[in-house]
């Protein structure tokens, strides 16, 4: 399991452009999720989800901490089983102003409820928010 349901990656043939909300400072250029296009991304539990994201680093950093959450009853709830070390997905250090592509693959844990929610990925570097994006998601069995 790896980084960003939301950030810079290598092309996956079936990936479609997904509408996303940038909750950072416009670092993210694009997000593509395997099998998804448009406003809502349907994902299935216990099946791999491939994400490709492009972003520009807003800081020099030697570490990246990743947090992926889903909204549940108005609360941001961490999604279990997500790799939190972004340097395992991207080669650190990152250089400010450089464009990166991240290829992230993760199995949606079976404990995640069947729900329409907003999945948010927050990547933090040594000097604060590195990138943040959110995608409307429908989790199904």
Curated annotation (Swiss-Prot):
Signal peptide: 1-15
Regions annotated as coiled coil: none
Disulphide linkage map: 23-132, 36-41, 87-92
Gene Ontology biological process terms in this record: sterol transport
GO cellular component: extracellular region
InterPro entries, A to Z: Ig_E-set, ML_dom, NPC2-like
Keywords on record: Allergen, Disulfide bond, Glycoprotein, Secreted, Signal
Gene3D superfamilies recorded: 2.60.40.770
Pfam families: E1_DerP2_DerF2
GO molecular function: sterol binding
Subcellular localization, as worded in the UniProt entry: Secreted
Glycosylation sites recorded in the entry for this protein: 103
Membership in a protein family: Belongs to the NPC2 family.
PANTHER family, alphabetized: NIEMANN PICK TYPE C2 PROTEIN NPC2-RELATED, NPC INTRACELLULAR CHOLESTEROL TRANSPORTER 2
Name the UniProt record assigns to this protein: Mite group 2 allergen Tyr p 2
């Amino acid at each position: 399991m790896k980084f960003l349901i939301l950030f810079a990656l290598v092309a996956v043939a079936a990936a479609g452009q997904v509408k996303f909300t940038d909750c950072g400072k416009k670092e993210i250029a694009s997000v593509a999720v395997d099998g998804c296009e448009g406003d809502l991304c349907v994902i299935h539990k216990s099946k791999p989800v491939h994400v490709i994201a492009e972003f520009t680093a807003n800081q020099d950093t030697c570490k990246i901490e990743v947090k992926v959450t889903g909204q549940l009853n108005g609360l941001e709830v961490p999604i279990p089983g997500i790799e939190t070390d972004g340097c395992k997905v991207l080669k650190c250090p990152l250089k400010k102003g450089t464009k990166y592509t991240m290829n992230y693959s993760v199995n949606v844990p079976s404990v995640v409820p069947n729900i329409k929610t907003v999945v948010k990925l927050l990547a933090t570097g040594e000097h604060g928010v590195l990138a943040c994006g959110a995608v409307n998601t429908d989790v199904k069995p």
